[in-house]
Amino acid sequence: MKRVLSTLIFVTLLLITWPACQSNQEVRIDDDDLGGVVTSSQGAEAGVWVIAETRDLPTRHIKIVVTDDQGRYLVPDLPQAIYDVWVRGYGLVDSEKVQTEPGKALNLTAVVAPDARVAADYYPA
C-alpha cells in the first residue's frame, strides 16, 4: 500500500510540475501579427527590441516591441504590408533585416557584439 501511495504522489507531482518544465516558446499570432522567438549564440534573448518597419504604406510605419524572459515577441495589429524586421539590444549589433508580412511566425537570430565598443555603436548607454 505504501508503494502504491508513494507512486501515486510521485505521478501527481510530476503531472503538476511538468508544464513548468516545458520550454514552450511558441508564440500564437493571428492574421495581422508578427511573432516568434529571438535567440543568439547565448540562447534566448530577453529584453531586446524587435523592430518592424515598412514604407509600403502612405507614411513610414514602425513598431518596436521588447522580448520577454524567454525571447518571445509579438508585434500586434499591423496593417498589411511587407515589413523589414530586425533585432537590436544591449550587447548586440543590429541583426540582418528580414522581410516578412503579418500573419507569419518569424524566429530571429540576434548577433552578439564582439566587444563593448562595437555594441555601443548600435545601442549607446
Where are these regions (language model features)?
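Short, acidic Ser/Thr/Gly-rich low-complexity loop/linker segments typical of extracellular
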Residues: 28, 55-72
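Glycine-centered loop-to-beta-strand initiation motif
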Residues: 36, 50, 67-75, 108-110
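Extracellular beta-sheet/turn segments enriched in Thr/Pro/Gly and aliphatic residues
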Residues: 22-27, 100-123
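Bacterial N-terminal signal peptides
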Residues: 8-18
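Short, ordered, surface-exposed loop/turn motifs in non-cytosolic proteins
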Residues: 32, 40-56, 80
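Short Pro-Gly-centered beta-turn/loop motif in secreted/extracellular proteins
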Residues: 45, 74-82, 90
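Beta-strand-rich domain onsets/edges
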Residues: 17-33, 37-43
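A short, solvent-exposed loop/turn motif at the edges and junctions
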Residues: 55-60, 82, 86-99
